[in-house]
């Protein structure tokens, strides 16, 4: 997992010195997790996907929208743009730490719905963000809230989001 937000340059992964490593990750069929906590990170992921069209990328924490401030426009545009790249996926995780005190699944629903609308259930996966998630909730409460946000999906779509998307992305053999 790449912690992009720990670097001063949000485009650092686009440096030529990273190119060969990214090519090898793609050749091995592996995926790259990217943390995006601001629009500049999301735009860099778009560039990364364009530069390495065979590289599977998952954007952790739905690019960390500021749920507590009900921030929407820039985040929604970034996610819609990311979704146009077929090798970019999104992880439904970490929203509780972006939601302030007293959050509920209703606070997250528009963000989840937007990602499902643009990425589809086959490119959205659940994640725990444990132990960081404990900063703004308990494990069971966060997990239950995440499941509530996908309750409207068909059983097949829920299977995608709950495990099949991650199984495909990370090449997990569950047999």
Give the label of every model feature segment.
Residues 10-15, 38-53, 68-81, 102-113, ...:
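Distinct, well-ordered alpha-helical segments
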Residues 113-114, 118-125, 134-175:
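Mid-to-C-terminal alpha-helical segments outside catalytic/metal-binding sites
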Residues 1-40, 47, 70, 89-95, ...:
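Active-site gating/metal-coordination segments in enzymes
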Residues 26-32, 53-56, 84-91, 120-124:
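Short, well-ordered coil/turn segments that N-cap beta-strands
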Residues 66, 97-100, 134:
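Short, solvent-exposed loop/turn segments at secondary-structure junctions
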Residues 1, 58-60, 91-93, 123-128:
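Active-site neighborhood of phospho(di)ester-bond hydrolases with catalytic His/Asp-centered motifs
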Residues 37, 63, 95-96, 131:
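Catalytic metal-binding/acid-base residues of hydrolase active sites
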Residues 25, 61, 90, 129, ...:
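Conserved, mostly hydrophobic/aromatic
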